[in-house]
A protein has these predicted regions:
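Canonical tetratricopeptide repeat
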Residues: 61, 95, 129-133
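Alpha-helical segment of the N-proximal tetratricopeptide repeat
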Residues: 23-47, 51
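Canonical positions in the second alpha-helix
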Residues: 48, 81-82, 115-116
Length: 143
């Protein structure tokens, strides 16, 4: 009887410790990202995705890292994955609008902007910067 209780207790402790370590991947990766240690944080965000594949935050931070590394294809892939998991993620929508403006894909920018205006809560002032970028692009084309 004591042996069964001991085994159950040890097993429970291992499960608790394991679930804590999974959660700490994201937290630790975010701390490293804030310190601009992108390679180390990228590795931890990728590990977090292995344990939590439906966590949009890890994909968003990976997209930000790939933006710093100027890897447009990976940045876009991670932003789209973020939006698949969390369609109302305003930061991902905003970053994707930036990419589409650079590509001059104004139909996509318009679609994203409409969606952004519906869901924005923290980044609403960024709409004016998107409008300004669009206006600047139109001015360049007229010249």
């Amino acid at each position: 009887m004591i042996k069964k209780i001991f085994i159950t207790l040890v097993f429970s402790l291992l499960l608790v410790e394991n679930s804590y370590s999974k959660e700490s991947f994201f937290d630790e990766a975010k701390k490293l990202f804030d310190k601009e240690k992108y390679e180390e944080s990228k590795f931890l965000f990728q590990r977090d995705i292995v344990f939590n594949p439906k966590k949009a935050g890890s994909y968003l931070y990976l997209a930000k890292i790939f933006k710093v590394e100027e890897n447009l294809m990976e940045e876009e892939k991670n932003l789209k994955t973020t939006l698949l998991l969390d369609p109302k993620n305003e930061e991902a929508i905003y970053l994707l609008m930036d990419i589409e403006i650079e590509r001059s894909n104004f139909a996509k920018v318009k679609e994203l902007k409409e969606n952004f205006e519906k869901v924005c809560s923290k980044l609403c002032p960024k709409i004016s910067s998107i409008n300004e970028k669009l206006k600047n692009f139109d001015t360049k084309n007229e010249s």
